[in-house]
Amino acid sequence: MRCGSLCRFLWLWSCLPYIEAMPIQRVQDDTKTLIKTIITRINDISPPQGVCSRPRVAGLDFIPRVQSVRTLSGMDQILATYQQILTSLQSRSVVQIANDLANLRALLRLLASAKSCPVPRARGSDTIKGLGNVLRASVHSTEVVALSRLKAALQDMLRQLDRNPGC
């Protein structure tokens, strides 16, 4: 039993020189490209008929306001919140954006691990209290505000990635 484990370990050890790690710059470039793709998808979604693109709606405090986030874990936390909001909207137009946010979060975790940062952990669903009530009252307004703020947050993240964010 021990000999078999040792043989497998030595065989894997001999393969290590041939395994190439993904360059961090390539991961960062993929992250920037995905952010630009998500921004393009948001731009392609036109607001529903009769809804202002910059509405002033009360009760949408759970949607993060635009603020500069300088850490990878902070970016992951904001994206987790937006992903949860978009998933709750159950709108066909935002399904792909929600999936893209999941992929973007995975790329940010890969960047964090390449920098030897602790793996970012998003907080639980308590960040979006009362979302169901707001969705029943104003689904379209919530979607417009969420996409508008997400777009601004992604543009800020794009700038921060150029500055090499910390953990």
From Swiss-Prot:
Localization in the cell: Secreted
The entry lists its GO molecular-function terms as: hormone activity; peptide hormone receptor binding
- InterPro entries registered for this protein in UniProt: 4_helix_cytokine-like_core, Leptin
GO CC terms of this entry: extracellular space
Q: Which residues form the signal peptide?
A: 1-21
Protein's job: Key player in the regulation of energy balance and body weight control. Once released into the circulation, has central and peripheral effects by binding LEPR, found in many tissues, which results in the activation of several major signaling pathways. In the hypothalamus, acts as an appetite-regulating factor that induces a decrease in food intake and an increase in energy consumption by inducing anorexinogenic factors and suppressing orexigenic neuropeptides, also regulates bone mass and secretion of hypothalamo-pituitary-adrenal hormones.
Q: Which PANTHER family match?
A: LEPTIN
Q: What is this protein called?
A: Leptin
Q: Which organism is it from?
A: Halichoerus grypus (Gray seal)
